[in-house]
Every structure is written in structure tokens, then in C-alpha cells.
From Swiss-Prot:
The modification Phosphoserine is found at S21, S26. The lineage of its organism: Eukaryota, Metazoa, Chordata, Craniata, Vertebrata. This is Tyrosine-protein kinase Fyn. Residues 271-524 form the Protein kinase domain. The modification Phosphotyrosine is found at Y185, Y420, Y531. Its EC number is 2.7.10.2. Its cofactor is Mn(2+).
């Protein structure tokens, strides 16, 4: 169905020359661009027409689902006759302030102003109301971005994490941008067999010069929708047929509202502390709400912990750090007692998760994957020329699906407590700190790499305190003499060798987080091809 050129048994075989005409220019590497991807800014009558499915020859193509592109409702005609692209809601959204709109999945909008970045001013065609909507909750009508199976800029490892989530059957699939070939896509499918059990296979979707798509030259399609329809009806050489699109989690918002995007010092009265989650040396962590309707985490700092002026200066930098493996800073109350408002992670700290929570039953593949997620977040911090200074499992938070995010980055530098600033005082995390940082205060991204090596031991030992049986002074002395922790029980030698690499005396000999991310993401798949050729493809 929708197949432009499907090979039947009696059909003549297509030549392979078409492959050579593909544009194989090298594309970006996933994760190197820290800037979120947005649609371009546009005015009411200058929105690019994402809904145009007409090929180079001007022939109208049939859109997936049998709707002809010439009659779809994705374009609103203005009085002057110009077309304005309509957007459709991909999720439900509940308004948080009087400035934004509540809406339901499937609702259509005309975009009035997109100059606010993550928040667009829009008019609902259902209610006629005008207000702000989060831009990552909508997509152009009839575009591939609006399809349930399209995940956009998603890396191979993250695709595998989502597809292997509990409850997805064999044949669950998604399509994402190719990491290696600009303009191409990847089809990722959950599969199962006796030898591997549940696993994911990836197929490259290539683009024809005339705008079509194919996995094999024997079956070419004018649209991705038609390709999905075809392989939903038959495996046709894939590991299995496409059964159901992977579930999309709600996209995260990097701001509480359009107003807090730039003015994010908020009144203390707008926050409600509901449940205390933890109590530390410098304050408490609460689950709470903002404006009575938005769940957040609130870190309250004891008065005197840090200078409000210094904190606000550092928070300006922290607010700009946006990555899906970093806990997002939303807002602050900068007068003492200082409140730090962040996204809420429902499984708590990685340390507690490993010692007393669901993490006790985790096997090595899950633990290595969690380490890879932390490395991915730290690789972003590395690219941004920032430093964490206090990387350990207590400062990693866990969410549903074993998602890990880095918290408290940058705060350690601001602490003014004498028991901490002495670096060898009772409150200082000596066992996680590189010797050059503990002894001489030389904190760099390479001292963070040392700490990451210690965090790896926490993962494989399910939260055991590093250097068991040794106090802080003994650890400092022994490490300076060259002592390194031995390989933990049941830890693979190759993983311990990575820890030792992180603990090199010379900081410059330690690996980068980019290397650590790649090593850990490919730890169990290094010997397998990244893309499947497919049977009979």
C-alpha cells in the first residue's frame, strides 16, 4: 500500500545504482548541539508550510490514512489568500497561569507569535481563546512531527531505552532522525528471540533524490507514512512487522511558564511544601507545588550555607544548562532561606534507590545503562565548559523507567560552611574527590571524571560507601601513595579498568566524558552492527 516500487517475485530486479545517487554527506553527532531544536520564528502569514506533501514533480501524494493532501485541513486561508500552517496538540496540557491555554490532544491552533522560544502565543480553533502554549506539545498538522511514531532527534541508546520499557510488545517501533546521515531517518523496532531475548533492531531509512524513502531499493515510498503502512502489514524482510508505535512520554518543560522564562525569581508564597523527601547537611528537599498546580522539587538551604548574591549569580548560569540528563532548574527564591525549585524526580536519589529501593534487584546491564546516562549528562557539562564539583550517587536523581538525571551541579563551590571549605573537614566528600582537588582546590572537569569513577563503584556495589573500612584521612593518604580500590565483587574486569582509567594521578590522562559515554553506551553492543541489513532486504 502506498508503495511506489515494490518488488514482486516476477518483477525485474532494480539496479543498485540508485544507492550511489544518495547524498551521503556526514551529519551531526547526536548530543553535540546543546541548543534545543525549535521551529523557526515566524509571523502570522509567514509560517513555513510544513504540510506540503507535493513532490518535485508537483504530483500530490496521498497522506497516510487515506487523506489526500489537497483536501487536508492543515492550512488556514487568510483574507489575503495566503496560507497559514495550523498546528495540532500532541498531548493534553493543563494551564498553569492565566497567560497560558489548557488544551486536549488533537486540538488545532493558529500560531500568532513564536518569538518567545519555548512558548508560543496561539489561538485555539476549538475554543477561540488566545494564550501561550508550550511549543514542544504541538506539531504542524499532517506533518511527520505529528505522527505517534515520530520521535525526532532521539539517539540510538535513548531509542532502545524507550522501546525496552516494560509493557512494550514485540513489534513496538519508532522513527527518529539518523545520527550518522543528515536528512535520513532510522527505524527502531523491539524484537525478541531465544538467544537474545528482548532487544532492539535499527534500520536506516534512506532518502531518494526526488524526495521518496526506502529501507531497500526494492520497496520505495513517497512518504514515511506510506513506508510505515507497508511494514505494518508485512515484515517484508524486517525482523517483524510494525505493530504499535512506542509510547511517547510527556515532553519536559524547561520553564514553569512563559513569565518565569526570563524572570525566574519567584515569591516564596507561590510555593507549597507538601512532603519532605530528604534532610541533608545543608538543608532539606521537599516535594511541593508551584501556583498550587505544578509539581516541583524544592531544595531549602539553611541560612548561612551560601551567599544569596553568589547563589543568584551561579543560578544565572545553571538556568541556561538544558539537557535531558540534567535536572532542570525552574526558579529560585534568593532571599534566605534560599529555595531552589527544580523538576521533580519521583524515585529519589540514586543512592537511596540502590540501597533501599527498586535498585537492589537491578542487574549489570541496567546499572551500566544508568552510568551511561550520567556520563551523557556530564558530557554536556563538559561541552559547556562547566564543572559539577560534587558528582556522586547522592546527587543523581532517578525517575520512571530508570531515567537518571544529574542534580546540584555547581552548588558545591558556593558553600561557606567551615567544615566543608576546609576540604578535609567532616562535611567534605573526600572519598569522591580527586586528590588534586581535595589537597589543592584544583577542581576541573577532570576531577569530575575521578568522581565518576567512584560513582561507578557505588553502582556496582548497590550504594556501598567507597573505601570501606577507611576514614577520610586514611583515604587521602593512601590515594596519594597510589592506592586504588580493587575490583568489586561481580564487577567485570573491563569495567574496573575503566574506573582505574578515571583515577589516573595525572588529570590529563583521565578520559573525557564523551569517551565514557560512548564506552558505556556500547558496553554490551560493541561487537554487533549498529544497523541491521534485514532478511531479504
Amino acid at each position: 500500500m502506498g508503495c511506489v516500487q515494490c518488488k514482486d517475485k516476477e518483477a525485474t530486479k532494480l539496479t543498485e545504482e540508485r544507492d550511489g545517487s544518495l547524498n551521503q554527506s556526514s551529519g551531526y553527532r547526536y548530543g553535540t548541539d546543546p541548543t534545543p531544536q525549535h521551529y523557526p520564528s515566524f509571523g502570522v502569514t509567514s509560517i513555513p508550510n510544513y504540510n506540503n506533501f507535493h513532490g518535485a514533480g508537483g504530483q500530490g501524494l496521498t497522506v497516510f490514512g487515506g487523506v489526500n493532501s489537497s483536501s487536508h485541513t492543515g492550512t488556514l486561508r487568510t483574507r489575503g489568500g495566503t496560507g497559514v500552517t495550523l498546528f495540532v496538540a500532541l498531548y493534553d496540557y493543563e494551564a498553569r497561569t492565566e497567560d497560558d491555554l489548557s488544551f486536549h490532544k488533537g486540538e488545532k491552533f493558529q500560531i500568532l507569535n513564536s518569538s518567545e522560544g519555548d512558548w508560543w502565543e496561539a489561538r485555539s480553533l476549538t475554543t477561540g481563546e488566545t494564550g501561550y502554549i508550550p511549543s514542544n506539545y504541538v506539531a504542524p498538522v499532517d506533518s511527520i512531527q505529528a505522527e505517534e511514531w515520530y520521535f525526532g532527534k532521539l539517539g540510538r541508546k535513548d531509542a532502545e531505552r524507550q522501546l525496552l520499557s516494560f509493557g512494550n510488545p514485540r513489534g513496538t517501533f519508532l522513527i527518529r532522525e539518523s545520527e550518522t546521515t543528515k536528512g535520513a531517518y532510522s527505524l527502531s523496532i523491539r524484537d525478541w528471540d531465544d538467544m537474545k531475548g528482548d532487544h532492539v533492531k535499527h534500520y536506516k531509512i534512506r532518502k531518494l533524490d526526488n524526495g521518496g524513502y526506502y529501507i531497500t531499493t526494492r520497496a520505495q515510498f513517497e512518504t514515511l507514512q506510506q513506508l510505515v503502512q507497508h511494514y505494518s502489514e508485512r515484515a517484508a524482510g524486517l525482523c517483524c512487522r510494525l505493530v504499535v508505535p512506542c509510547h511517547k512520554g510527556m515532553p519536559r518543560l524547561t520553564d514553569l511558564s512563559v513569565k518565569t522564562k526570563d524572570v525566574w525569581e519567584i515569591p516564596r508564597e507561590s510555593l507549597q511544601l507538601i512532603k519532605r523527601l530528604g534532610n541533608g547537611q545543608f538543608g532539606e528537599v521537599w516535594m511541593g507545588t508551584w501556583n498550587g498546580n505544578t509539581k516541583v522539587a524544592i531544595k531549602t538551604l539553611k541560612p548561612g550555607t551560601m551567599s544569596p548574591e553568589s547563589f543568584l549569580e551561579e543560578a544565572q548560569i545553571m538556568k541556561k544548562l538544558k539537557h535531558d540528563k540534567l535536572v532542570q532548574l525552574y526558579a529560585v527564591v534568593s532571599e534566605e532561606p534560599i529555595y531552589i525549585v527544580t523538576e521533580y524526580m519521583n524515585k529519589g536519589s540514586l543512592l537511596d534507590f540502590l540501597k533501599d529501593g527498586e535498585g537492589r534487584a537491578l542487574k549489570l546491564p541496567n546499572l551500566v545503562d544508568m552510568a551511561a546516562q550520567v556520563a551523557a549528562g556530564m558530557a554536556y557539562i563538559e561541552r559547556m565548559n562547566y564543572i559539577h564539583r560534587d558528582l556522586r550517587s547522592a546527587n543523581i536523581l532517578v525517575g520512571n523507567g530508570l531515567i537518571c538525571k544529574i542534580a546540584d551541579f555547581g552548588l558545591a563551590r558556593l558553600i561557606e560552611d567551615n567544615e566543608y571549605t576546609a576540604r578535609q573537614g567532616a562535611k567534605f566528600p573526600i572519598k569522591w574527590t580527586a586528590p588534586e582537588a581535595a589537597l589543592y582546590g584544583r577542581f576541573t572537569i577532570k576531577s569530575d571524571v575521578w568522581s565518576f569513577g567512584i560513582l561507578l563503584t557505588e553502582l556496582v556495589t548497590k550504594g556501598r560507601v567507597p573505601y570501606p573500612g577507611m576514614n577520610n584521612r586514611e583515604v587521602l593518604e593512601q590515594v596519594e601513595r597510589g592506592y586504588r580500590m580493587p575490583c568489586p565483587q561481580d564487577c567485570p574486569i573491563s569495567l574496573h579498568e575503566l574506573m582505574i582509567h578515571c583515577w589516573k594521578k595525572d588529570p590529563e590522562e583521565r578520559p573525557t566524558f564523551e569517551y565514557l559515554q560512548g564506552f558505556l553506551e556500547d558496553y554490551f553492543t560493541a561487537t554487533e552492527p549498529q544497523y541491521q541489513p534485514g532478511e531479504n532486504l
